[in-house]
Amino acid sequence: MARRRRPERREILPDPRFGDVVLSKFMNSVMLDGKKSVAESIVYGALEAVEARAKKEPLGVFHEALANIRPNIEVRSRRVGGATYQVPVEVRPDRAQALAIRWLITAARNRSETTMAARLSGELLDASNNRGNAVKKREDTHRMAEANRAFSHYRW
């Protein structure tokens, strides 16, 4: 573990087409093996498909989908006297965004459409309408936290 100060966070540049930092982070998460141009074509293709299918502004649908997936509370394991408790804790905004992005991409990759752009557009549309596997993951997380509410006094 580093003994010095924490390194400052790198500033992520906004994406070239929409000028949005969150979309840029999303693209970086979609990227595999450092192939940014492939990730860009997938994400932009998905956003174009969203625009064609939903007749809505694609960036708005993207942000709405992320807002619907973003968790407010999660459970973390805490060991107390030989027993491990699942303690519900609030999620920091930056972690909530990271989890939402991760869950959205995982849900899209598990879909059955042919191309990744089609899978991503389908999951974005589902998530913006409060459906789909990514939203289900958020609901499951909230349900877990609610079920373990009795252990909330073990917060740290």
UniProtKB/Swiss-Prot annotation:
Keywords in alphabetical order: Ribonucleoprotein, Ribosomal protein, RNA-binding, rRNA-binding, tRNA-binding
Organism: Sphingopyxis alaskensis (strain DSM 13593 / LMG 18877 / RB2256) (Sphingomonas alaskensis)
Gene expressing this chain: rpsG
Annotated protein name in UniProt: Small ribosomal subunit protein uS7
Keyword Methyltransferase: no
Free-text function comment from the UniProt entry: One of the primary rRNA binding proteins, it binds directly to 16S rRNA where it nucleates assembly of the head domain of the 30S subunit. Is located at the subunit interface close to the decoding center, probably blocks exit of the E-site tRNA.
Domain of life: Bacteria
The keyword Chloroplast appears for this protein: no
GO molecular function term, any single one: tRNA binding
Record GO cellular component, one term: small ribosomal subunit
Family statement: Belongs to the universal ribosomal protein uS7 family.
GO BP, one annotated term: translation
Subunit structure: Part of the 30S ribosomal subunit. Contacts proteins S9 and S11.
